[in-house]
Amino acid sequence: MGLKYFSHLPEELREKIVHDHLQQERKKEFLEKAIEDSCRRHVSLLKSDPSPSEMYSLSKFLDSLADYVGRQFNTRCLIKWRKDVPANIKFQVMEEQHLRLYGFLDMDDLSCRELLPPEEDDDITYEDGMIVNCSELDKLFAALGIRVVYITVSNNCICTPLNKDIVIS
């Protein structure tokens, strides 16, 4: 609503609109802080040797965060794994994603794709039952006109596209 029309509204309605807007902003700030705190808690798992329950927690958190980010941007959101994340962590999380989506179906196929060529020095993601290089996936999505955003996981941070300030180191 333009400011020109806003100034002509009754005082009570203007106050209600301002109050509702501020309430939405406070909710958004609270949620961003909660996401930041959760990222901080989960980033510590990237440096240690996490237990199976911690891996499950990390996987569930990243999936929930990807769903939320996807809804906020009204597009597909994937988890981009940087090269510096230990292989055992990223592949366990991707395996957990696969199990949630497909059960034990095609688990052998997923295991074979863990062995990416050593000359491939690219970030990877899990998409539709496969582990793929992000650069190849970006080219494919661009050619198809599909917009995608990423949650980037590296050895010492989890970055979201929600707010550039939510970079946890």
Swiss-Prot record:
Instruction: Give, from the UniProt record, the effect of changing residue 112 to R.
Output: Complete loss of viral replication stimulation
Tell me where the sequence motif LXCXE motif, interaction with host RBR sits in this chain.
110-114
The annotated region (Binding to host SKP1 protein) lies at: 9-22
For this UniProt record, the keywords arranged alphabetically read as follows: Host-virus interaction
UniProt KW Metal-binding keyword: no
Q: Which domain of life is it from?
A: Viruses
Methyltransferase recorded as keyword:
no
User: Its biological function?
Assistant: Interacts with and disrupts the function of host retinoblastoma-related proteins RBR, which are key regulators of the cell cycle. Induces transcriptional activation of E2F-regulated S-phase and G2/M-phase-specific genes. Inactivation of the ability of RBR to arrest the cell cycle leads to the stimulation of viral DNA replication.
Q: How does it assemble?
A: Interacts with host SKP1. Interacts (via LXCXE domain) with host retinoblastoma-related protein 1 (RBR1). Interacts (via LXCXE domain) with retinoblastoma-related proteins (RBR).
- Give the family per the record: Belongs to the nanovirus Clink protein family.
Q: What's the name of the protein?
A: Cell cycle link protein
**Origin organism of this chain?**
Faba bean necrotic yellows virus (isolate Egyptian EV1-93) (FBNYV)
